[in-house]
Regions:
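Cytoplasmic helix-loop-helix junction between adjacent transmembrane helices
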Residues: 126-164
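Hydrophobic core of transmembrane alpha-helices in multi-pass small-molecule transporters
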Residues: 32, 116-136, 312-326
Length: 404
């Protein structure tokens, strides 16, 4: 059934920040709880695949990329569901799929000692299901938030939903390492099954927003409309992808402790930038903000690549998180303003699909590169992609100036 209730009246321009935040807050809290389950296995999966299942760096990249590939393939459906049936339904379905993914993690853990290949297959199936769930949660939450507060606040919606996601990553990663040490991968699996139930308790009491009226633009046309900002998102997301997939192995390769803190520092930089500068893409324009942010991320990736001690790697994670933080809403503002309201969910799905493309392709490619050059080389790749995103931001800025 469709979501049936519209948001309250928009506040006056002079008092927009607090009412907008309060309307987004319940969604952000639910997304935080849901993505805590995604963050738990982040530092654990590379160790589990490389160690308990005795696979190599390439398979680590494939397992990491499986979730993102599945998310990519489900984006069109997620956007269509949010537009046709309501964003609330999409979010609820996403959390249920996340819990189902945990059941496959449990199966993988049960098979690991005697049938490692079957365990790997179950793990990959769980990652694929999690990818579909993540797609529905993110697309639905973004569409729901923009429906509540209006497209003029799209940057704030993306900013605060993003804060929830990366705060969950930042806290979930060290918690996952502790849980893995205490209860093994089975503990991670049970947590993945149960945590979405908490998120559902937060989401179900919330009122939805009506699907916007009007003619819906076909998804392939929406994809074309958001192509350029989506390319910027794809390039700037590679740095995030190589941190999530390979940082534990980089620290092991260099004989360092504290890999889980890289996720915390990345998340900390991400959150601080969002807290203090969330409104900049709406105020200054997405292209201008993106131009600065991707340069900061490139510096962070360079520090991780060249670091001789963990301190410099920690600094690189902080800068990478801060730079990536506003790049997502900055490019996203440019995407939203290109599509009609009736296709907003499809636009969110199409835009975030570029993140999936980046992570689904970059993780296996980075795994191949790591096998040739070592794990440090993947951060040179992340920095080069961030510099490529600068070129996209310059192109977007030129188009905005030409249209003015």
């Amino acid at each position: 059934m469709s979501d049936s209730s519209t948001a309250g009246a928009m506040p006056a321009a002079g008092g927009v920040a607090r009412p907008v935040f309060m309307q987004i807050l319940p969604l952000a809290l639910a997304v935080f709880v849901g993505f805590f389950m995604v963050g738990l296995p982040m530092p654990v999966l590379p160790l589990y695949v490389d160690g308990a299942l005795a696979q190599g760096a390439l398979m680590v990249g494939i397992v990491a990329g499986m979730q993102f590939a599945a998310a990519l393939l489900s984006r069109a459906y997620a956007g269509s569901l949010a537009d046709r049936r309501g964003a609330r339904l999409a979010v609820v379905a996403g959390f249920l799929l996340g819990s189902a993914a945990g059941l496959f993690y449990l199966l993988a853990d049960a098979l690991a000692s005697r049938e490692p290949q079957a365990a790997l297959a179950a793990l990959m199936a769980g990652r694929a299901i999690m990818g579909c769930g993540e797609s529905l949660i993110v697309t639905g939450a973004l569409s729901w938030g923009v429906g509540r507060v209006g497209p003029q606040n799209a940057g704030r919606v993306m900013a605060w939903v993003g804060v929830a996601i990366y705060a969950a990553f930042g806290l979930g990663a060290p918690a996952g390492m502790r849980l893995y040490g205490a209860a093994g991968f089975g503990g991670i699996a049970w947590a993945t099954v149960l945590i979405p139930m908490i998120a559902l308790a937060l989401v179900l009491p919330q009122r939805g927003v009506r699907a916007a009226g009007g003619t819906r633009t076909p998804f392939y046309r929406v994809l074309g409309l958001v192509m350029l900002p989506g390319l910027g998102l794809a390039l700037t997301s590679v740095g995030f992808g190589v941190i999530t997939a390979f940082i534990s192995l980089l620290f092991a390769e260099r004989g360092w402790d504290g890999a889980a803190w890289m996720f915390t520092l990345f998340g900390g930089g991400f959150i601080l930038a969002r807290v203090f500068f969330a409104g900049l893409p709406d105020k200054l324009g997405g292209a201008r903000v993106a131009l600065v942010c991707v340069l900061i991320e490139a510096v962070g990736q360079w520090l991780i690549w060249t670091s001789a001690t963990p301190i410099w790697a920690f600094a690189g994670a902080l800068l990478s998180g801060a730079g990536y933080s506003l790049a997502f809403p900055a490019f996203g503002v440019e995407a939203v303003r290109r599509v009609p309201a009736a296709s907003r969910g499809a636009a969110m799905g199409a835009y975030v699909a570029f993140l999936d493309v980046a992570l689904g392709i970059a993780s296996p490619v980075a795994g191949w590169l790591a096998g040739l050059q070592g794990y440090g080389a993947v951060y040179a790749m992340g920095g080069a992609c961030a510099l490529g995103a600068m070129v996209v931001a310059l192109a977007l800025r030129g188009r905005v100036a030409a249209a003015a």
